[in-house]
């Protein structure tokens, strides 16, 4: 029979293993959604960043996407602009800066429809938990994201 510290270690490992499995499935899902939308997964990730963080400079997009070549982000933004997903505009505060902004109409709306089933499935799953449990789950997810962000930065630096 497991002692309490052993049971805790096992649960921590189970949570970690499940997190990695879910992350892998998420990558595969994003590849599939990008394919359905006729874009590549880097372009899809760019749209996801703009959706969650709002307008960003090309430099900030490149850093967040892990693109190291200067022309790579230009190619991503050019493709997305031609397809109607984003537009370039001037920063209202510093007119010298260019911001890339998500265009929520048109092709992006169709992309959101593809993601609708996942969003509904998550809402159904969340219904199984109390508000207090969801608060804990959200806190863990935010903190796990921070761990992943820091580990990714460490890898890029090394």
Model-flagged regions — what are they?
Residues 45, 71, 135:
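Active-site phosphate/pyrophosphate-handling residues
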Residues 22-29, 114-125, 144, 148-151, ...:
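Alpha-helical linker/hinge and terminal dimerization helices associated
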Residues 56-89:
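Helix-adjacent hinge/juxtasegments
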Residues 31-68:
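N-terminal helix-turn-helix DNA-binding core of bacterial DNA-binding proteins
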Residues 79-135:
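Charged, amphipathic alpha-helical coiled-coil/dimerization segments
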Residues 14, 18, 117, 121, ...:
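Charged catalytic carboxylate motif
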Residues 1-5, 134-158:
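C-terminal regulatory/oligomerization modules of transcriptional regulators
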Residues 1-41:
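N-terminal leader segment of winged-helix/HTH proteins
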């Amino acid at each position: 029979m497991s002692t309490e510290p052993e049971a805790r270690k096992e649960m921590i490992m189970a949570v970690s293993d499940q997190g990695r499995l879910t992350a892998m499935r998420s990558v595969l899902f994003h590849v599939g959604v990008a394919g359905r939308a006729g874009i590549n997964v880097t372009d899809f990730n760019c749209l996801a960043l703009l959706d969650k963080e709002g307008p960003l400079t090309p430099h900030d997009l490149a850093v967040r996407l892990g693109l190291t070549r200067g022309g790579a982000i230009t190619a991503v933004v050019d493709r997305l602009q031609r397809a109607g997903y984003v537009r370039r505009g001037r920063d209202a505060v510093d007119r010298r800066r260019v911001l890339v902004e998500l265009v929520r109409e048109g092709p992006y709306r169709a992309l959101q429809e593809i993601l609708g089933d996942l969003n509904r499935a998550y809402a159904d799953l969340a219904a199984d938990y109390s508000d207090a449990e969801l608060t804990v789950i959200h806190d863990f997810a935010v903190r796990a994201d921070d761990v992943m962000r820091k580990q990714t930065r460490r890898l890029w630096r090394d």
